[in-house]
Amino acid sequence: MKKRKGLLIILDGLGDRPIKEFGGKTPLEYANTPNMDRLAKMGILGQQDPIKPGQPAGSDTAHLSIFGYDPYKVYRGRGFLEALGVGLDLNEDDLAFRVNFATIENGIITDRRAGRISTEEAHELAKAVQENVKLPVDFIFVGATGHRAVLVLRGMAKGYRVGENDPHEAGKPPQEFTWEDEESKKVAEILEEFVQKAHEVLDKHPINEKRRKEGKPPANYLLIRGAGTYPDIPMKFTEQWKVKAGAVIAVSLVKGVARAIGFDVYTPEGATGEYNTDVMAKAKKTVELLKDYDFVFLHFKPTDAAGHDNNPKLKAEMIEKADRMIGYILEHIDLEDVVIAITGDHSTPCEVMNHSGDPVPLLIAGGGVRPDHTESFGERECMRGGIGRIKGHDIVPIMMDLMNRSEKFGA
């Protein structure tokens, strides 16, 4: 029995809702995607709910579910996964947070992402905060990708029941940090002190002075959320399926998930996780990994960002960009030897500007696949596909079975 290789491609936030300016089509249906459509014709389509029907999923919990883990059991907050993703060496008693560089004016958050500042700017600003802010505990503050950053409070894991200051929409003041016990109260007080001192450093930083002169929103405030401790992973993905697994990822959160479950993670030069990401660099790295790894995970972020930005046209353009990436991969592999699955971690409809509970399009093609009669890759075609509507955690077992790597249950 020939064992095949597996390629899981996640186009972050892929699913959407009908767009009036597209004649009622979704961005995926509107986009020109000859490569994914070719796979749809030779493969099988369906829909998947990353958690359960109608439940909006975070990128962290969605990815954990898709890789076969029960997020209700293993998830311990986003922050720790972000920290793993930026390569920090953490201890089990550390407490980590996801942070946004944001813009504040007269006590009101005017932009939760500070105009989507560049990764280079974020890293320089984070360095200034780390060097100039003093706290009663040891801490690490580093930039991640784009407007994202990570904060780690050393030895404060017992205070994980702390809230956040992120109002989750512009036009509102920052929230006050809530707490549930004495340990989390200590953490809340430290976070308040950190945010205030960081604001003083950021507001007068040369990068923000330059941004103001250019008419760009300054990254002069920090929104902190997602308190997290070490995830409770019962068994590594690589151990469970007895495969060598590699991943091509630019975004720190998803890197953290992949590292936590045993993947070797690669970020080729030019892969930014932003609209300008070099898809050919990611495609070439994916083809390279498929030579040495049994299972490869390729992540693409810009589709999600366009949904959050309520930009249907840009989302369609990013889907087309992803299709070109997929086209390169198809030119350099033998589909008889590889099982490909393409989906999103969740839906990010432009009208919602956030994650929703809408089901996510799913495509599986390659060796061993019994094709259905679908013609293209889109939300409505997926509704009539042969896979039906499944849970996110069913995707990998289906792939592994087609790869001839599953074990029989029973005699």
Curated annotation (Swiss-Prot):
PANTHER family: COFACTOR-INDEPENDENT PHOSPHOGLYCERATE MUTASE, METALLOENZYME DOMAIN-CONTAINING PROTEIN. The keyword Isomerase applies. Pathway: Carbohydrate degradation; glycolysis; pyruvate from D-glyceraldehyde 3-phosphate: step 3/5. It catalyses: (2R)-2-phosphoglycerate = (2R)-3-phosphoglycerate. SUPFAM superfamilies: Alkaline phosphatase-like. Coiled coil: none annotated. It comes from Thermococcus kodakarensis (strain ATCC BAA-918 / JCM 12380 / KOD1) (Pyrococcus kodakaraensis (strain KOD1)). NCBIfam families: apgM (TIGR00306), PRK04024.1 (NF003104). Its EC number is 5.4.2.12. This is 2,3-bisphosphoglycerate-independent phosphoglycerate mutase. GO terms for biological process: glycolytic process. The keyword Isomerase applies. Belongs to the BPG-independent phosphoglycerate mutase family. A-PGAM subfamily. Pfam families: Metalloenzyme, PhosphMutase. Catalyzes the interconversion of 2-phosphoglycerate and 3-phosphoglycerate. GO terms for molecular function: metal ion binding; phosphoglycerate mutase activity. The gene is apgM. Keywords: Glycolysis, Isomerase. CDD domains: iPGM_like (cd16011).
